[in-house]
Amino acid sequence: MEFPEHSRHLLQCLSEQRHQGFLCDCTVLVGDAHFRAHRAVLASCSMYFHLFYKDQLDKKNIVYLNSDIVTAPAFALLLEFMYEGKLQFKDLPIEDVLAAASYLHMYDIVKVCKKKLKEKATTEADSTKKEEDTLSCSDKIECLSDGSSHMAGDLPSDEDDVEEEKINSKTDLATESGNMWIRLSSDSASIPQTGGEVDTHTTAAGKTADSPCSSTGSLSHRSATSMGDSTDVDCVLDLSVKSSLSGTETLNNSYLSSQEILRNSLVQVKIEREASCEDNDIHTSEYDIERNTVKENVSSNIRAPYEPVHLAPIREDSVLRELDHDDKAINDDMITPENERVQMEANIDNSLLPYVQNILSPAGQIFMCPLCNKVFPSPHILQIHLSTHFREQEGIRSKPTNDVHVPTCSLCGKTFSCMYTLKRHERTHSGEKPFTCTQCGKSFQYSHNLSRHAVVHTREKPHACKWCERRFTQSGDLYRHIRKFHCELVNSLSVKSETLGLPAVRDWTLEDSSQELWK
């Protein structure tokens, strides 16, 4: 017989005991915050606590967590999850919970946090894109309203005059920029034409479009015979214009509106100019707009009287300013990570460049030689370089001349490349131990021995077993553990790799491992 609610009831009882402090056998310290809990629950939910209590169960009543990585609110949330099985972020930053879960090896929580961060980033990107689209649309609408404000103020107020003027003729003036349309319907007589006819090119659907980027910048007109088809076209604005409005003023206002639309639309403009062109050629510069628009050419007889000549220099100056801005942006982009990499490699020893080029990354860490201040991309290459400083000649070197001073040991007569290696060598004769531990007072001959000893006091276990995840303070303890518990596994893997032609076990990378393990 099974009791499905047993696990939930057990968690509830454990949570109540934790809040009451009943049977709590450990205390977790995160900075100044104290958390009472049960070892069994902590070890069951976190691999960090499992390994922490595995070795010395009776001597670890207090657990110190790194407050720089794990914050008290984040650990409190994870502790509630351990006892209740519910994860409620509330107002806590997801990044803090992710850092704490990674530190405690709670991989399920890590996956959830990464998923939430990814969704958050996607949502923010979508909202930013919508805001940009909204702003661009509002800018275009403002341009449309500004361009038509002059004509809207001259609308007829007398209905009888409007009815009387509708009988005469009707002319539509269209302006296109991207996907935004303006249609100014004239209910009065068409603009007087001084001669010639208007050349129009219709699309497959029968619609007429203007070219806002013609060589003279003027607008084309639709003929009066297109009055019947104008009602079938969707318009953004449909404004009526009195017959008293002069043709020059109408075209100038329309030209201003079209230029505002062109300035705010996302259209790429290319200017083809010759260095030897005359001043008149500036007004006839060829504009190629990379967009699928229908172009109209207005005959010279019509566009000459209404050419807004005073706007041509303004249009030319604005386009030139944009080109100068693009050139400046290109020059700013010349400083790239690739250039930084070239500058960094320039400081590296030329003899090592063939080895460095395949290793150095644009954001890689660099290592500096303390003797000659040369920079290297990895500690391995730095060690190779240091060997050139510390290399000792075989046997005893010949006695140097009085003009050259070579570091020489006064006891055994050995010569060295620098004073640093000579001082290290002299400690073997004197037994000097200049490096002393501040915790226990133990002394060591070399600094790396002191660093290895300091781990004993910090209780860190940087050496991990690849097979059982046990961690050790010293690398020698890890070697002995592998020989004792995983020797058969290592041998079987070695045989298997030789049979299948796989890389040998001695080629595998272990944390802080040594070839002495396989001797």
From Swiss-Prot:
One of its GO terms (biological process) is regulation of transcription by RNA polymerase II. InterPro entries: BTB/POZ_dom, SKP1/BTB/POZ_sf, Znf_C2H2_sf, Znf_C2H2_type. Residues 201-227 have a biased composition (Polar residues). It holds the Pfam family zf-C2H2. Disulfide bonds: none annotated. It comes from the Eukaryota. GO terms for cellular component: nucleus. Keywords: DNA-binding, Metal-binding, Nucleus, Repeat, Repressor, Transcription, Transcription regulation, Zinc, Zinc-finger. It is found in: Nucleus. SMART domains: BTB, ZnF_C2H2. A zinc finger (C2H2-type) spans 367-389, 407-429, 435-457, 463-486. Residues 189-227 are annotated as: Disordered. One of its GO terms (molecular function) is zinc ion binding. Residues 24-91 form the BTB domain. Belongs to the krueppel C2H2-type zinc-finger protein family. ZBTB18 subfamily. Transcriptional repressor that plays a role in various developmental processes. Specifically binds the consensus DNA sequence 5'-[AC]ACATCTG[GT][AC]-3' which contains the E box core, and acts by recruiting chromatin remodeling multiprotein complexes. PANTHER family: ZINC FINGER AND BTB DOMAIN-CONTAINING PROTEIN 18, ZINC FINGER PROTEIN. This is Zinc finger and BTB domain-containing protein 18.3.
